[in-house]
A protein has these predicted regions:
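Helix-loop junction hotspots and adjacent acidic micro-motifs that serve as functional foci
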Residues: 1-283
Length: 283
């Protein structure tokens, strides 16, 4: 097997142990207090609840790999009724000998195009770039969509810039000053990922840091400039090549939107929305 990197975060570990200790202590002290027990015993995050109907706008997909031994693809959607971001994920373990060789951009592209979801057996490649109507769909507390075959999916149009008018009125998507809180909070539950829609016509100030193994770039539309970055990895190889191409002098300048993950100190690109389509440029 391939050797795995192991990362240890003392603060996260201490927080988990502290929460376990404090919760167990309070449970033992309040065995007859039903109200307190209800607050202490948190519902399972993986529980999914069924909703009769919902309308979604695809925002692209990107590949990922964890240090704990998993890899996969996550597609992002804007849930119109709740004005929130939802995800649909396809994943598998890469610590088995027969799956390690699949962790390449080429094989993940096949996974993006071939694996099917929901009643109409649509692929992530198609779902992530389309407007959808879902019936009897399942969603959990972390805004993750279930791949249940009981869900009925009706695909309407390809997503283009013209579909973003409503999304751009949502502060969480258009206001870049709204970022995830980087300060530690014992009582804060894990929050869903935050996305941004960044307008740009071209990229500038592209540089690759050999020391950090990270690409830095600026998204500009002639009026505003927004900085982003992307760490190098085998899965990000195609994306970095695409971003470098967009920074070349000969690249046509036209209106686009970069869908980005918000981080406290940077923006990480996911996909590009143009006047004609969504470009899942990692694949």
């Amino acid at each position: 097997m391939l050797a795995k990197h192991v990362g240890f975060q003392p603060l996260t570990t201490f927080a988990t142990l502290s929460r376990l200790y404090n919760t167990l202590t309070l449970l033992l002290r309040n065995t007859q207090n039903n109200e307190m027990l209800g607050k202490l015993i948190e519902g399972t995050r993986s529980n999914y609840y069924t909703t009769p109907i919902g309308h979604f706008t695809g925002l692209g997909a990107y590949p990922w790999q964890t240090r704990s031994g998993y890899f996969g693809i996550t597609a992002y959607f804007f849930y119109q009724e709740k004005e929130s971001i939802c995800t649909l994920t396809s994943s598998m373990a890469d610590y088995y000998e027969h799956t390690q060789s699949l962790v390449t951009p080429e094989n993940l592209r096949k996974q993006l195009e071939m694996q099917s979801f929901w009643g109409n057996s649509a692929s992530l490649a198609r779902l992530s770039i389309s407007t959808l109507t879902l019936r009897n769909f399942k969603l959990n507390r972390q805004n993750r969509l279930s791949s249940s075959s009981q869900t009925q999916c009706e695909i309407a149009d390809k997503v283009t810039i013209g579909h973003l008018n409503t999304l751009l009125t949502v502060p969480e998507l258009s206001d870049l000053s709204i970022r995830p809180d980087q300060h530690y909070d014992y009582f804060r539950k894990k929050q869903p990922e935050q996305l941004a829609l960044v307008p740009f016509t071209h990229l500038s100030e592209i540089r690759f840091s050999s020391y950090e193994q990270k690409l830095y770039f600026t998204m500009t539309d002639g009026q505003t400039e927004t900085e982003g970055s992307l760490a190098y990895s085998e899965l990000n190889r195609n994306a970095i090549r695409k971003l470098e191409q967009l920074g070349q002098p000969y690249t046509e300048k036209k209106q686009r939107y970069m869908v980005c993950q918000k981080r406290p100190d940077t923006l990480i690109p996911i996909s590009i929305i143009t006047a004609s389509e969504i470009d899942n440029f990692y694949f």
